[in-house]
Amino acid sequence: MKNIVLCLFISISIDLIAFNNEISGNRSNSEKSKLKELEINNKYKIEPNDLRLNLLREYTKKHYGEACIYLNNPQIIVIHSTETENLEIVVNIFKNDLLIGRTDIEFGGEVNVGTHFIIDTNGEIYSNTPLDYIARHTIGFNYTAISVENIGFADNLTEEQFNSNIKLIKYLKNKYNSIKYIIGHYEYNNNSLPHFNLYKELDINYIHTIKIDPGTNFMNRIRNKLYNYGNSDNLFN
């Protein structure tokens, strides 16, 4: 009788373990499926032309020592806010191949600033520079960083933007195992933070611009949310 009870207990335990594993597996697959299905609008996607690519080669040669246009195994996601009122302004800025009206960084090269993603105030995510290519957005890190621009002003971004940032970060982390750090633009030149070990700048005269975007409160919320999601600590810098 004892043997029968013991066998029954073992059988039930195994079934419960299998059931729990199945549920966990389904949840994991479901989450991965949602990540793959993230809606990204390609309306403002820019396919770099020869002029932009040549200017980008000049920029990367000057600052990183190699004329490279491709973003391989990105290690950082940089969160920005545009410090502008609407999407149209930003799209018109990024569509130019040449840098215009930026006397603060014109010494660094002629290629225009850019971003990989733009998130509007309603939370809609737009692709801009294709992920295959480097974009000019953060001094010292463009060679290894993905840029996410949020329409609006530091620490005054919308709840819809916050939610879309979380979704996009999860999507990118799932896409690239190489990603180690997520930083706010205002943190880029803080050499006390772990991401700074990736800093690369050959031009010692290139002046670091002071940034406040996207705001400390916004970044703190992102990090708290990602911690709950279960990402590793090094993502929080």
Regions inferred by a protein language model and the residue ranges of each:
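N-terminal catalytic cores of peptidoglycan-degrading enzymes
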Residues: 19-138
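Basic/polar, cationic surfaces and motifs that engage anionic cell-wall
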Residues: 19-53, 154-237
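Cell-envelope and extracellular/periplasmic
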Residues: 82-83, 141-155
